[in-house]
Amino acid sequence: MNQTLDRFTGAAVYLDTMLPYALLRGVEPAAKAFFERIEQGALTAYTSALTFDELAYRLLLALIRDHYGGAPLDLLRADEVRLITEFAPAVAAQLQRLRCFPYLTIVDVTPADLEVMEQAMVDYAIRPRDALHYAAMQRVGCLDLASHDAHFDRIPRLRRFIL
């Protein structure tokens, strides 16, 4: 059974995309409270550069949906250059806000992570992106994860926390 992040007492946690997304979109008061703990230095947070790719894409789609309604992916496919031009400044500002967050360490994805990714996909039947997150977690020695993705529960060494 997963615990909620407000009960997290460890020294470090790895952030999946959902937690920064919830903070930047303002959709979960619990995300703001958790990031306040990080900002105060009560714990260290890690995430991967890969998270920023996922986050930028989700933020872009959310802004398109907010502004135009409908199916944002269909709209983006139909008018990609205009929509990216329109919303990229707002997305970039949000990413910059996150990158400057104190006590948040952004780890690179390295070539050595690919071997861990491949093995994790085989061993735990998880998606490639999530297997790369797992590789980054192993490399920094942080196996506590903030994520709503239940498939991470297939990795016995991880402890998953939710909002």
Residue ranges and their predicted role:
Residues L19, T51, D113, H133, ...:
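Alpha-helix capping/helix-boundary segments
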Residues E54-L55, V116, R154:
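Phosphate- and divalent-cation-binding pockets in alpha/beta enzyme and binding domains
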Residues M1-E54, R58-D74, V140:
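Short, well-structured N-terminal submotif of metal-dependent ribonuclease cores
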Residues Y14-D16, T47, I126-P128, D149, ...:
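Histidine- and aromatic-rich ligand-binding microenvironments
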Residues L24-R25, L59, M121, P156-R159:
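Short, flexible helix/strand-to-coil boundary loops that buttress conserved ligand/catalytic motifs
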Residues L61-A93:
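Helix-adjacent hinge/juxtasegments
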Residues N2-F8, A92, Q96-D144:
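Active-site neighborhoods of divalent-metal-dependent phosphate/nucleic-acid chemistry enzymes
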Residues L43, E86-F101, D108-V109, H148, ...:
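Anionic, Ser/Thr-rich low-complexity intrinsically disordered regions
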